[in-house]
Amino acid sequence: MQTSPLLTQLMEALRCLPGVGPKSAQRMAFTLLQRDRSGGMRLAQALTRAMAEIGHCADCRTFTEQEVCNICANPRRQENGQICVVESPADIYAIEQTGQFSGRYFVLMGHLSPLDGIGPDDIGLDRLEQRLVSEKISELILATNPTVEGEATANYIAELCAQYGVEASRIAHGVPVGGELEMVDGTTLSHSLAGRHKIIL
């Protein structure tokens, strides 16, 4: 079937989004063209500006259009000396939504993966080490994902902290709130048992 080259180009471009296959891309393209051209224009403008203007924070490496992001620039976020290490900027948004953390962050943009040729410098651990040397850090909270690579990355950073006398802690993993034990996998349940705490009345 012969279709508009621009329409084909739009559908192919939409497929760069995660979870969007040919059918989803086709549906999105037709929806924008048929029902929401103004929405499509706003999307195009927002994408163009974001791609051109959003870079990385000079301190924590999260996404920002400024040299230093709002969190790193906030003096109150520096008071407790805590830095939470995460794998991606999306993790910062997740933690910020809890309202439970008032320190700063460091974004790895990935995790250690020797099989894929990703070493310490590739995820910015050289820059993190510089911060351990130059800043007054009371605690590094390791919030990497609970995967094999995430655990290996957390262990590597913990060893780095030990060299500089900085306390390192790992976020707890375990049974989700509202979950049922019979539905939880063995590895998660093992983490829950190992990370149990006393009930204080």
Swiss-Prot record:
It comes from the Bacteria. GO terms for biological process: DNA recombination; DNA repair. Transmembrane segments: none annotated. CDD domains: TOPRIM_recR. InterPro entries: DNA_Rcmb_RecR, Rcmb_RecR, Rcmb_RecR_Znf, TOPRIM_dom, TOPRIM_RecR. PROSITE patterns: RECR, TOPRIM. Gene3D superfamilies: 3.40.1360.10, 6.10.250.240, RecR Domain 1 (1.10.8.420). A zinc finger (C4-type) spans 57-72. HAMAP family: RecR. Belongs to the RecR family. May play a role in DNA repair. It seems to be involved in an RecBC-independent recombinational process of DNA repair. It may act with RecF and RecO. This is Recombination protein RecR. It comes from Salmonella arizonae (strain ATCC BAA-731 / CDC346-86 / RSK2980).
